[in-house]
């Protein structure tokens, strides 16, 4: 039976990309349907308020860009705060600034000038004897030396990938962000911040006037959903979209443990702390 097209666009997934497409297309007069298999909008940037705190339910997401048009676009929707990502790593009770910069090198070796830091890194490179790195571990040591690798890279990387660093390919860490200035800003982009009121508020604004169906799995009735829209914009797992005929992609996930603590003021003194196996 012929089913009349009801929508110009079916958008599968209500994360940042799907929502942005829905917003822009709706602005141009197209009729869109957004579906999401989760019980909420926003995808992995979903936030909810807990005791006045905007909690990022799927891990922290800091918006950053050097494109002025993009920055003006998101700020036309909601106001962004001036959050600057400056994480610290806690290794055996000692704190190190990230990304690797002169503060890190001072904390690690006591050096105070870029020249001293470069000499220390070069010394450890030579001592490693690694000329042609065959895996991630060798690549990292050849780039930054053994001290920083074993203190700040190895454990967290192995947890992140679920494999030994010696089993991971070298290209994963071809470039390491290394700065020879006292700059703890994690990103090089010109603009960064987090939406005031959380990402969910921004997503809600973009979806205003757009039909949204939650708890709706595209693959639960794919033939039907494909039939009701002229075009489909899919933002989910790409291997599943092609029925795995090109193989299966390996996905890593994150386990979240939430603990509500009663405290006054700052608990850690920074928003983002890394431990050998955890982030807080």
Predicted regions and their residues:
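Short His-Asn-centered micro-motif
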Residues: 12-14, 35-37, 65-66, 197, ...
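N-terminal Rossmann-like FAD-binding beta1-loop-alpha1 element of flavoenzymes
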Residues: 7-34
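Structural/interface elements that position substrates and couple domains in central-metabolism enzymes
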Residues: 72-76, 148, 268
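Glycine-rich FAD pyrophosphate-binding loop
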Residues: 26-51
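Active-site/ligand-binding neighborhood in enzyme catalytic cores
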Residues: 92-96, 103-231, 235, 240-242
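Short, Lys/Arg-enriched N-terminal segments with co-localized hydrophobic residues
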Residues: 1-4
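Dinucleotide-binding Rossmann-like beta1-alpha1 core, especially the glycine-rich loop
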Residues: 51-127
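Mid-domain catalytic core of redox enzymes
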Residues: 28, 219-280
